Amino acid sequence: IQALKGISLEINEGEVVSIIGANGAGKTTTLQTISGLITPKSGSIIFEGKNLLKEKAHNICKLGIAQVPEGRRIFSKLAVKDNLKLGQFTIKDSAEKKEEDRANFYKVFPRMSERKNQLAGTLSGGEQQMLAVGRALMSAPELLLLDEPSLGLAPNFVMMIFDMIKEINKQGVTILLIEQNANMALSISDKAYVLENGTVSLSGNAKDIAKDDRIRKAYLGIA
């Protein structure tokens, strides 16, 4: 089954870019292809002038791309602080620098500091999602791929996660976002792409796409 059919995306440094579309449109496949979990038959993936097409996932991570998968996939029997440490395995910095990076994360997101000695599996769903994002940030990515970060979360945590995304972007991390809550995703994005059956059916400024009648009806629940 061919999930993607010649799609073309452009993400500029410092942007938040959203991909929206129905289930099965190819959104997750797109992220997994960029991060090296899936190898496409043809095409190119250019990141900072380098073609990543044949690169392994761990090398892509070292080059500055990190993915937060749908479903979080944290290490539930490890403490929060140990989950964060695992996110630093590709970094060659000193132990002191790694500790400093974790401390800076705790400063920006104090809720995680309060939970750092707690087993990850005992966190709420929203806290686990914050941890999953934090673990990805520990690899010091320039591009962060987020797959359905608000899926299954209570409304208060949805807002918290989106505030977290905005703060991460403010600190200079470029973000590619897949999100079921298209309204929220478009509200924080610079650009957006609409995927349908593995192809890009619409792209452009996120605010303009949010005003498109077809998109409003299909994805935003507005007749």
Q: Where do the protein language model's features map onto the residues?
A:
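Glycine-rich phosphate-binding loops of nucleotide-dependent enzymes
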Residues: 1-223
